UniProtKB/Swiss-Prot annotation:
Monomer. InterPro entries: eFR1_2_sf, eRF1_1_Pelota, eRF1_2, eRF1_3, Pelota/DOM34_N, Pelota_arc, Ribosomal_eL30-like_sf, Transl-rel_pelota. The lineage of its organism: Archaea, Methanobacteriati, Methanobacteriota, Methanomada group, Methanococci. This is Protein pelota homolog. Belongs to the eukaryotic release factor 1 family. Pelota subfamily. One of its GO terms (molecular function) is endonuclease activity.
Length: 348
């Protein structure tokens, strides 16, 4: 995320989202009644051509809308914000509806009553754009699962079988093994960032040696770590271990996974945790909240009613973490009601 300009007297921040992660961050920052300004396409009638029966022509215009619906479309790499027009050229009626498609590299101005957690999220997005992206390959000698680590979740890129079999002779198995390595490398060769190979056995080490010999351009980006499991279980193990943080700096998804692990541990021993809105509100009555945890879905549904609690947490120097439901840790928090807290001290 690039922050272009801040205009405090108007509560406006001009910014440019650079990738899908930034669009996800924006989907959690923009809320109903915020004003959004951007260059967008709008179909307008050609009043000078009365004979044409079509719906007019599309042209680019600078519009402002008051947000009503905010929809993040991962598959289409866009954030759609719909609402009534509040600023437009003279030939476009104020009060009519329009949808602004926010895509990477589109400059957007957001006008709202900026909260500390909104600004913290913008800073996170700005910082994350400077960090290397990470692909994780969880593998052994028979299968490899390839994942892209994003700010808001994990995308499975490929699952590759090795073809190595006890029914084949040594030469055939060697051919199958190198074909397996080649398929893995073809799946990641265009990726710009760090590549983490992990899993049980020596498969990860063998492919590292193969890359060092055959693909020297990729070799500097390769990191190898141990894991006891393959597949998604191995990925979960890696996320909980903190290994991603060593590569990435501090990966948001890794941080979220670790803090939910801590929450579940505290809940299991009836320790420093509260979950569900009633329990969390009770903890706030004692000023006991250290970290308030919300799923992005819960915040979007309840933002107007939950902001007082969020303000109260910040007033006692507590922290707030909004967790994506696109990965397992967020789904675990959702199962707890979508809202929980880590506490400073136990309460009855």
């Amino acid at each position: 995320m690039k922050i272009i300009q801040e205009i405090p007297e108007k509560n406006i921040i001009k910014l440019i989202p650079e990738n899908l992660d930034d669009l996800w961050h924006l989907s959690n920052i923009i809320q109903p009644y915020n004003a959004i300004y951007a260059v967008t396409e709008r179909r307008t009638e050609d009043k000078g051509d009365k004979l044409r029966a079509d719906r007019g022509t599309k042209r680019k215009v600078f519009l402002g809308i008051k947000a009503e619906k905010i929809n993040f479309h991962e598959d289409f790499n866009r954030l759609r914000v719909s609402g009534k027009i509040i600023h437009a050229p003279e030939d476009i009626p104020i009060g009519s509806y329009h949808t602004i498609d926010i895509e990477p590299l589109l400059q957007v101005s957001v006008q709202k009553n900026w909260k500390k957690w909104d600004l913290a999220r913008l800073k996170d997005a700005e910082d994350s754009s400077k960090k290397p992206k990470v692909v994780v390959v969880i593998m052994d000698d028979s299968e490899a699962d390839i994942f892209l680590v994003r700010e808001f979740g994990i995308k499975e890129l490929a699952s590759i079988k090795s073809g190595v079999s006890k029914k084949l002779d040594y030469k055939q198995n060697e051919q199958a093994k190198f074909s397996y390595y080649s398929d893995i490398i073809n799946s990641i060769s265009e990726f710009e960032g760090k590549i983490l190979f992990a899993g049980p056995g020596f498969g990860k080490n063998n492919i590292q040696n193969y890359i060092s010999e055959k693909h020297k351009d990729l070799a500097p980006n390769v990191v190898v770590e141990s894991a006891n499991h393959t597949g998604k279980s191995g990925l979960s193990e890696i996320l909980k271990s903190g290994i991603i943080d060593k590569i990435y700096g501090e990966a948001r998804i890794s941080k979220e996974t670790q803090i939910i692990e801590k929450l579940l541990e505290e809940i299991s021993k009836k320790g420093l945790a509260a979950y569900g809105i009633e329990s969390v509100n009770n903890a706030m009555n004692y000023s006991a909240i250290d970290t308030l945890l919300l799923t992005d879905e819960y915040l979007r549904r309840n933002r107007r009613t939950i902001e007082e609690l969020m303000n109260s947490v910040e007033n006692i120097n507590g922290s707030i973490l909004i967790i994506s439901t696109e990965h397992d840790a967020g789904k675990q928090l959702k199962a707890l009601g979508g809202i929980s807290a880590l506490l400073r001290f136990p309460i009855e």
